[in-house]
Structure formats: structure tokens, C-alpha cells
Amino acid sequence: MNLAGKVAIVTGASRGVGAATAVALAEAGCAVACAARATDATPLPTPGTLDDTVRRITDAGGTAVAIPTNLAADDEVRAMVATTVERLGPVDVLVNNAAITFPGDLELPMKRFDLVFDVDLRAPVIATQAVVPGMIERGSGAIVNVSSAAALNYYPGQMAYGMAKAALEHLTMSLAAQLRPHGIPVNTFRIDVPVASEGFVAALADIDHSDWEPPEVAAEGILWVLRQPAAVTGRQFGMARLRADAGIMESRSARPHTQAPGMVTASHLDTPPPAR
């Protein structure tokens, strides 16, 4: 997809990978709707707000709007899409990036379990339901679901998060099959190397982050996926594989990715991306 002149929604755009992706899309010529909870008026403990992201974009001459959204609330997710259409125009690109997690496996209270699934899985489904009719009508569009190595591996205390990400990757596969006849690609971008987003740095403050990727590296990968032909759909693109096969994201160069403490690995299911 040629991103110039397109309208994009990025969830979780107040900080980290979401903010970096919103900025990168604006630099590519998109008008960007930035959605999340944190604003200047209603900040969260972790640094970063929607207003920060929008200022970065508009100060550089781009177009962006902040759409405060509680992604655990169905009506607010639908309103996010409706507001984007009202303020920027029909949605061409949806990046389902927002995610939350809580520590705990089987002992995790169901209220928190449900909240993880509401934000990490249900919100992407509802947002997709809201944007797809317009994409089908126009015969174009693209959706990227941002996943994690937790979809394929067990990290102690992250059972619900891993389950939600695994389901999100299945959503990609299912949507790709349904939307292929309409020329609308749906792909997964899997973050499978450490990224120094504000949230993870705060949560893992005792770990050395010096060789972690900056969020901008993940954003570069997401835009690479969006720029592929519409025939490239239903794929799971991992950051590590894209670095090796697509020649992007070189900040860690040839340094091997070290396995996180306590991680139990599963077989890697990525397929190689197409030639550029």
C-alpha cells in the first residue's frame, strides 16, 4: 500500500510502539488518529500521552488527532472509529497495537483476566468490525495486529497475555481469509525481540535494557508490512525474521537475541517474508 494521503488509526498511541508507529505513519503521509487513555488532562503513571504524540506529529508538519478511548469499553471503540471518520475521513489503515497485562497465571483474578482479553483481543475485533465495511466499499485498506513472542512461548506470570496474543494471531488468519476477496490484507507483526517501550522498561526496571530495540524499530517493521502488496495477507512477521530477511531494523545488527529469563520456547512458526 502507498501510505501517502491515507487515514490511519493506531491504538495504544500514547507511548512506546504505538506512538512511534503513529509518528512514522504521519511521516509517510498519513493523517493519523491516535487512540489510548492517557492525555495531558488524564495522565497515567507511565510517561506518555496522546497529546505528546499528536504534538510530535503536528510540530513536524503532519496531521494527527487525539481520540481518548477506553479500549475495554465496546462503545468507546466504536466511537473511536466514528470520530476518526468524522474528523479525518474514511479509515484506510488500522493498527491494533494497544495491549495490557497483569502478573499472574492460573491465580490471576478473573476480573483482570477479562480486562486483558477486552483490551488485547476484543477491542481489535470491534475496531475491525467498525472499519471493514468502509474498506470493502472502497475496495482497499490494510490491518496490522501487533502481537508478541508470548503468543508462542510461556513467560511466567503472563498466561492471560499470551493467550490473548495467540488468539489475536488466529484473528489475523481468519480475517485474512474473509477479506482476501476484497483486496484487504490483514497481517500480524510479532514483537519477538526486546523493545524498550516505556511500559516494559517501567515494569522490568531491574533488567539491563541497554541492548533493547527502541520503539521506532518496531514502527519501521509495521510500516514495512503495511507497504506490502495486498496479496501478502494472513502472515505473521516477526521482528527478528524481518531483520534477517528484509534488511531492516539493524540497530542490534548481528547480535543474537537472548532468551528472556524463565521463558519456555515453542517452535517458531514464522514463514519467510516475500522479497522486497
Set out the residue ranges of the language-model regions:
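Active-site helix of classical SDR
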Residues: T128, A164
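Conserved mid-core segment of classical short-chain dehydrogenase/reductases
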Residues: T46-T49, R78, A99-D114, G157-A160
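Conserved glycine-rich cofactor-binding loop
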Residues: V7, S14-R15
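Residue(s) in the substrate-gating loop at a strand-loop-helix junction
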Residues: S148
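C-terminal helical subdomain
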Residues: P181, T188-F189, A205-A275
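Catalytic Tyr-X3-Lys loop
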Residues: A99-I100, P109-I126, S140, V144, ...
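Conserved glycine-rich Rossmann-like NAD(P)H-binding loop of the short-chain dehydrogenase/reductase
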Residues: A28-L50
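Alpha-helical segment proximal to the catalytic Tyr-Lys
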Residues: P133, A177-Q178
